[in-house]
Amino acid sequence: MRRRFSALAVVLAVVLAVAGCTMRGRRQGPSRPPSLGVSSAPTTTAGTARATLARPGAGSTRGLPGMPAVPDPGDVYAAARPGRLSPVVRGFPARVYVPNSRDDTVDVLDPRTFRRLARFRVGRQPQHVTPSWDLRTLWVGNNQGNSLTAIDPATGRRGRTVPVADPYNLYFTPDGRRAIVVAERLRRLDFHDPHTMRLRHSLPVPCFGVNHLDFSADGRSLLASCEFSGHLVWVDVAAERVTGLLRLRAGAMPQDVKLAPDGRVYYVADMGSGGVWIIDAARPRVLGFLPTGRGAHGLYVSRDDRYLYVSNRGEGSISLVSFATRKVVATWRIPGGGSPDMGGISADGGVLWLTGRYNGEVYALDTGGGRLLARIPVGRGPHGLCVYPQPGRYSLGHTGVLR
C-alpha cells in the first residue's frame, strides 16, 4: 500500500524560489522533497480557503500565447464533439490500446469486434497510453522503466523508446510547447521538449503523490492532484512555477482532474473520500463535494458535454454527474462486479471504455444506459487505456483529453 501522509504544512515560498531556478540538464537521481514545517504561506484548507492565488484566468479572454483559439468560449470541448476528427487522424484505424502494468505489455483491441488484435512488450510498469499534442504519436509511460515507448497509431505498431525519469503520467501544455511528465515518485513536474523528450525544466511540487492534472480554459494555469498528502496544487503554465496550494480534508486521496465544459470549475475524483470535489477554477476554493462511490478514480466528459462519468473502482460502478445541476443523476453497476479504473470514450460517444485494474479485463459500456457490451480479458494490471482516434484539434495528454 502506498503510504498516506497526514496533515502537512508547506513552506510554499521556499518552493516558489526553487521553482524559479530552471534545470537545463536531466537529473540523474530523485530530488529532495520540499521542506515540511510550520508555514504562513498561501496554503488553504477545504472549508476555510481564504488565501489568494494568482488567478488562473477562468474568465479571461486572452489564452496562453500559441494555444489554438477556443471555438466556443462556453464550451472548452466544442472541438471534440462526435465526428470532428482532425485531418491528422482520419486515416487511423479505430483501436483501444491497453497498458498492462504488471505484465509490461500493451494489448491492442478492435472496438468493433471486442477482440484482441496484438500484444507487444514495452518498458517496466506501463501506466498510461497518451496521445501527443499533435495527435501523431501515442506514448506509453513506462513508470518503473523510466522511459516512454512510442506507438504509431497509423499502424498500431511499437516504435522508439526514449529515456525519461519516472513517467507516471504525461500531459502537454495547450500551446504544444512542452510535454509535462508527472514524476510522482520524484515529487515534481518535468517539462520536456514534446518531440525529442529532452528535459528542459524540473519543477518540484510542495505535496506528495502528484499524478493527475488539467488545464484552465485559457490554458494559462493547471491544477494538479497530490494523492498521498491530499493537496491540490496550481501551476502557472508559461512561467512553470507553483502559484497556489489547497489542502483537502483528512484522508483525501485526490485522483483524476477534469475541467467542466464552461471552464468555471474543476472536478477532482477522491478515492479516499468516495466522491468528487468541485473546485473553483478562479481561486483555491472548494464549492462542494459529491459522493459517488468507493474508490472514485477516473473522470470522463460525455461527447455531448452533458455528463461527467466517474469510475468508482472500489465498488465496480460508474456515476454520472450532470454538468447542468452539478449533481449525481445515475449510477451504473458492472454486472458481477469489477474494478473500473481509467479509460476513454469512443469517437462517436456511444461507448465508455474502462480498464478493470484488479480483474485483468476491459469493460465496454453503452453510454445510452450503462449496459455492459463486452468484458474483454487482457493482461495483468490494466491501467490507463487509450481509445484512438478521438475527435479534437490537439491533445492535452493523459488517456486522451482533447480540445
Task: Show where each model-derived region lies.
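Predominantly soluble domains enriched in secretory-pathway, periplasmic, or organellar proteins
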Residues: 16, 21-403
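Sec-dependent bacterial lipoprotein signal peptides
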Residues: 1-18
